[in-house]
Every structure is written in C-alpha cells, then in structure tokens.
C-alpha cells in the first residue's frame, strides 16, 4: 500500500508555505486537515516552468496523450504539428493515436503514456504505474505533468460540450 495515512494519498501531508497559491484556491474547499487537490499541487513548482524543466517534446507528449484519451480532434489537430516540430517522433505519435503497445519506447515516453492511459481510461493509476512515472520524472515534475494533463482534459471537455469545430480550411489529423 503506497498511501500515506496522514494525507490519504500517495504524497505525505505537507504544511505551507506553498509554491503556488494553493491556500487561496483550495483552503475553503479542502477537507479537514488540508487534504485534497491543493495539498497535492503543492508538491509541484507550477506549470509555468514545466517546459523548461522537462522540455517541449515531453510537454507535447503529455498534451497529445490527453487529447487522444478524450478523442479531442481540436486539441490533437492543433498540437500534433507542434509536437513534431518539438522533436516528438512520428512512431511515438502513432503509438498514442492508434493505441499501440508502449513496448520499445524510451522509459520516459512509455511511463507517461502508460500513466495517462490508466488515469484517463481506468480513472485510476495503479501503484506500479505510479512508481514507474515517479522514477521517470520525480515528484515535482510528475505533479506538474498531471496538472498539465488535467488542464487539457478540462479543455477537451469544454471543446466537446460546445462542439468546437476546427478552423476553416484545417484538416483533422486525429484518426482512429
């Protein structure tokens, strides 16, 4: 069991000061003892510095795997060319797009894709998958990668709810 008794999550309870405005955002909404998303986000350094820490290629990978998990044509089509420009290889993009096995990918790519597939497909991340992603990215970067994926999942929900179409003349790039 990898759950800490004090926080009731995979990260131990932590007292402030926080790197982000966690208290202002989540202080009223947190359950007793400061549990909840703000407590977890406090382990990150913030999405504004994530790209500098992990590189554009991995940021694009996180965005694409999230777009694919939500079948978000808009997000996929807007980000897939940027992912290629950032150095994300076409064979890795194909693994995401066509839900192919992650065997043979480098460790960070495989860990991130496996993590996201469980998170968005099973609505849970199993202990072994979590440990693999933690080893690949470290605690701070993993928290911020999940925050990035969460932000893009929220975007996918908004785009789907309001049936956002691609810009005029832009061909869809996500096929199933």
Where do the language-model regions lie?
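Secretory/endomembrane lumenal or extracellular ectodomains immediately following the signal peptide
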Residues: 1-56, 175-176
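Short acidic alpha-helix initiation/capping motifs at coil-to-helix transition points
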Residues: 17, 34-41, 71-77, 111, ...
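Structural motif
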Residues: 18, 51-58, 104-109, 136-141
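N-terminal hydrophobic signal/anchor transmembrane helix of membrane proteins
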Residues: 21, 37-42, 61-78, 143-160
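Helix N-cap / loop-to-helix initiation motif
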Residues: 54-55, 87-91, 126, 138-139
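Histidine/lysine/aspartate-rich catalytic loop segments that bind and position anionic ligands
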Residues: 80-106
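Acidic/histidine-rich alpha-helical segments that form the ligand environment
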Residues: 106-146
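Acidic, carboxylate-rich catalytic segments that either coordinate divalent cations
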Residues: 132-134, 141, 150, 154-176
């Amino acid at each position: 069991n990898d759950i800490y008794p004090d926080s009731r999550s995979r990260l131990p309870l932590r007292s402030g000061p926080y790197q982000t405005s966690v208290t202002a955002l989540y202080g009223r909404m947190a359950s007793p003892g400061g549990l909840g998303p703000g407590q977890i986000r406090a382990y990150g350094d913030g999405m504004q510095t994530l790209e500098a820490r992990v590189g554009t290629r991995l940021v694009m990978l996180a965005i694409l795997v999230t777009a694919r998990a939500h079948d978000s044509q808009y997000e996929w089509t807007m980000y897939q060319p940027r992912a290629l420009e950032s150095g994300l290889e076409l064979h890795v993009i194909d693994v995401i797009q066509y839900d192919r096995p992650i065997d043979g990918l480098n460790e960070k790519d495989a860990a991130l894709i496996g993590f996201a597939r469980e998170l968005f497909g099973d609505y849970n991340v199993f202990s072994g998958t979590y440990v693999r992603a933690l080893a690949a990215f470290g605690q701070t970067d993993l928290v911020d990668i999940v925050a990035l994926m969460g932000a893009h999942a929220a975007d996918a929900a908004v785009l789907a709810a309001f049936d956002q179409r691609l810009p005029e003349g832009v061909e869809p790039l996500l096929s199933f």
